[in-house]
Amino acid sequence: MGRGKIEIKRIENSSNRQVTYSKRRNGILKKAKEISVLCDARVSVIIFASSGKMHEFSSTSLVDILDQYHKLTGRRLLDAKHENLDNEINKVKKDNDNMQIELRHLKGEDITSLNHRELMILEDALENGLTSIRNKQNEVLRMMRKKTQSMEEEQDQLNCQLRQLEIATMNRNMGEIGEVFQQRENHDYQNHMPFAFRVQPMQPNLQERL
């Protein structure tokens, strides 16, 4: 009894769909390998699952197969994308060339071919550029002056604190020196006093002298 013909439509059950995909995918890759070996054919197969996972087989370099495809068909894959990319590259190159020309003009180079209107536009651009440069220069100078003033004020504060510290140290030293001189003066004064006026540590009993 032969197998019934399977209706070709999307399998709704996700589990059954995944099982069928795995079996059919393996079968396609197997057939691709077989035909490449049996018939010496150049075969390339790329399969993308619904999940985005890719499976592939290529009997030779995929790049070589694509090059041969391009030569034989005269068509390139992703022509629209490549065309847009080429247009974008050409636009960038053109913009870069124009910027190089403008830069040379701003430097005073290659301006002999410019007409009066173009020279006026160039002059305005230079004046605007000079104005921007002067404004930036003035801004930098203001910042430098402000920073210098702040540093000078900080230096003045440090000098004031240092001076106060020096004065306090000097006063302390003078006080210590004054105490030393006072002690010396007291000692010298006692040494020059008459013997009768000197304070004796002990006075003998006057009755014992009599």
From Swiss-Prot:
<dbReference type="InterPro" id="IPR050142">
    <property type="entry name" value="MADS-box/MEF2_TF"/>
</dbReference>
<dbReference type="Pfam" id="PF01486">
    <property type="entry name" value="K-box"/>
</dbReference>
<dbReference type="GO" id="GO:0003700">
    <property type="term" value="F:DNA-binding transcription factor activity"/>
</dbReference>
<dbReference type="InterPro" id="IPR002487">
    <property type="entry name" value="TF_Kbox"/>
</dbReference>
<dbReference type="GO" id="GO:0000977">
    <property type="term" value="F:RNA polymerase II transcription regulatory region sequence-specific DNA binding"/>
</dbReference>
<keyword id="KW-0238">DNA-binding</keyword>
<dbReference type="GO" id="GO:0005634">
    <property type="term" value="C:nucleus"/>
</dbReference>
<dbReference type="GO" id="GO:0045944">
    <property type="term" value="P:positive regulation of transcription by RNA polymerase II"/>
</dbReference>
<keyword id="KW-0805">Transcription regulation</keyword>
<dbReference type="InterPro" id="IPR036879">
    <property type="entry name" value="TF_MADSbox_sf"/>
</dbReference>
<feature type="domain" description="MADS-box">
    <location>
        <begin position="3"/>
        <end position="57"/>
    </location>
</feature>
<dbReference type="GO" id="GO:0046983">
    <property type="term" value="F:protein dimerization activity"/>
</dbReference>
<keyword id="KW-0539">Nucleus</keyword>
<feature type="domain" description="K-box">
    <location>
        <begin position="82"/>
        <end position="173"/>
    </location>
</feature>
<protein>
    <recommendedName>
        <fullName>Floral homeotic protein FBP1</fullName>
    </recommendedName>
</protein>
<dbReference type="InterPro" id="IPR002100">
    <property type="entry name" value="TF_MADSbox"/>
</dbReference>
<dbReference type="Pfam" id="PF00319">
    <property type="entry name" value="SRF-TF"/>
</dbReference>
<keyword id="KW-0804">Transcription</keyword>
<dbReference type="InterPro" id="IPR033896">
    <property type="entry name" value="MEF2-like_N"/>
</dbReference>
<comment type="function">
    <text>Probable transcription factor.</text>
</comment>
